[in-house]
Amino acid sequence: MSTDNKQSLPAITLAAIGVVYGDIGTSPLYTLRECLSGQFGFGVERDAVFGFLSLIFWLLIFVVSIKYLTFVMRADNAGEGGILTLMSLAGRNTSARTTSMLVIMGLIGGSFFYGEVVITPAISVMSAIEGLEIVAPQLDTWIVPLSIIVLTLLFMIQKHGTGMVGKLFAPIMLTWFLILAVLGLRSIIANPEVLHALNPVWAVRFFLEYKTVSFIALGAVVLSITGVEALYADMGHFGKFPIRLAWFTVVLPSLVLNYFGQGALLLKHPEAIKNPFFLLAPDWALIPLLILAALATVIASQAVISGVFSLTRQAVRLGYLSPMRIIHTSEMESGQIYIPFVNWLLYFAVVVVIVSFEHSSNLAAAYGIAVTGTMVLTSILSTTVARKNWHWNKYFVALILIAFLCVDIPLFSANLDKLLSGGWLPLSLGLIMFTIMTTWKSERFRLLRRMHEHGNSLEAMIASLEKSPPVRVPGTAVYMSRALSVIPFALLHNLKHNKVLHERVILLTLRTEDAPYVHNVRRVQIEQLSPTFWRVVASYGWRETPNVEEVFHRCGLEGLSCRMMETSFFMSHESLIVGKRPWYLRLRGKLYLLLQRNALRAPDQFEIPPNRVIELGTQVEI
């Protein structure tokens, strides 16, 4: 979805509520309960309640309203956002060394997202199903099985797309936020004293009174802003203004009212700490609220799943992950995709997490490290963009960065206390993804360098072939070429073994640009190199999927007629062996071999008919 289409502002804003704010919107299910559950050494005390509420409120204001919605969302690449987009923008006007550091930061941030995405569906759905403990305590043993059943159904429908179901997301989430507001307001009216916590003095008093324990407790407070990255990542779907409008008119007021309503309830009934969210509701509303909470958490999980599909496609297109099958589930919306391998790997990981942790309170200990780590990296990358791309005053940018880090670093440091009790999980998953992405990128570069370091000059070889041509056969041959100035391996091997050349030879290069989309006018560049050789460079954005048939269509419009079923596609298939290296580089090389063996083959990747493909093998030592 984009603001470019002719939908009204209210419709786009409503849609943003349904997709963007699912994660942060379901945080009231567990945040205040975790803050005051007694794990930090204090119970439901007036000063503690006021302190936590004040911290939550001002985090929502500073981190979400000011940092992300006002500052970070200014950094867009043709309207698109996300940590990899920010990485790309930050590295545009910097030195090679600085760019390398920024790329590493961006990849770490993307890896953190993969670590977080395993936890979000599990903690969200489990916290909703745990409402059964209030409705029918004897059913508490069913929480884990029911959570797995709900998530199984969610992952199963991914292959069908979420277009039809997605139309229900917005009204359900709007209802959810309105119910949050009503439940909270009802409780605040009964105990308006809780509104004193709006004063930031209570946050300061909280630190002064509880000292070291208050710092560690920040690890629970951060649960209130999980999902904040989605605001920036989904910017390309809805636009900046609708996302901001949804936050300030619906989401922020509803969250604040509900958190303060829970606080008002706890001041009167401290025993409600076992589940303050559900105990806000009257008895007759518990079952409807349980159903609505389950729907809201499913929607929050769907938003995260869609986010990991989008991030994976972007990483594949930018060359940080191996090619994999990407299925478009909508003819109208390019952003609706399904990646089977990622879907079922994520499902398996989520089920393992649910079975292992058993309760959302246990999972809360694992939550936060990835979120706050990404926040630190976002602060550094976004201020780099402000300085290098927007040319803001360096002292002003430094003040902004210091202000952001004064919040981000304490939050991240407080979450490190969770490392042994569950925080190791997202960090481990993030480390695995970082290793995979850096291995694929670096080893792929090493492979291409080895293949082309002894490559012949393209111009010289074409001149030689035109002067002393081999036997010519009718038809058109397309050779996939990664480098513009080097003869493709497949062409060299075809001449070496078959000693023939087609009447027309097209050297096709598919290139990914540093933009989400490439206009059709710029899609194809054609250059005639000789009477029988042409070079075609097709450019795509990282949100687009290359399609050779579309390239041929554009070539036809520009005078180079190509018919798919009358063309032979020659591709090189590299058989790789790991050469002599230090042991740690040998391990990385073997990981690359494993990734390459399981990567999507080029004919499937570019939608080339299998019966038109000829693969010529070559052995390369890396």
UniProtKB/Swiss-Prot annotation:
Cited InterPro entries: K+_transporter, K_trans_C, K_trans_N, Kup
Homology family: Belongs to the HAK/KUP transporter (TC 2.A.72) family.
Locations listed in the record: Cell inner membrane
Main location: membrane
GO cellular component: membrane; plasma membrane
Protein name: Low affinity potassium transport system protein Kup
Origin organism lineage: Bacteria, Pseudomonadati, Pseudomonadota, Gammaproteobacteria, Enterobacterales
Role description: Responsible for the low-affinity transport of potassium into the cell. Likely operates as a K(+):H(+) symporter.
GO biological process: potassium ion transport
Entry GO MF terms: potassium ion transmembrane transporter activity; symporter activity
Name of a matching Pfam family: K_trans_C
Membrane topology per record: Multi-pass membrane protein
NCBIfam families: kup, PRK10745.1
Gene name, Swiss-Prot/TrEMBL: kup
Parts of the chain that traverse the membrane: 9-29, 49-69, 103-123, 137-157, 165-185, 213-233, 247-267, 276-296, 337-357, 363-383, 396-416, 419-439
Keywords: Cell inner membrane, Cell membrane, Ion transport, Membrane, Potassium, Potassium transport, Symport, Transmembrane, Transmembrane helix, Transport
Reaction it catalyzes: K(+)(in) + H(+)(in) = K(+)(out) + H(+)(out)
Organism annotation: Salmonella typhimurium (strain LT2 / SGSC1412 / ATCC 700720)
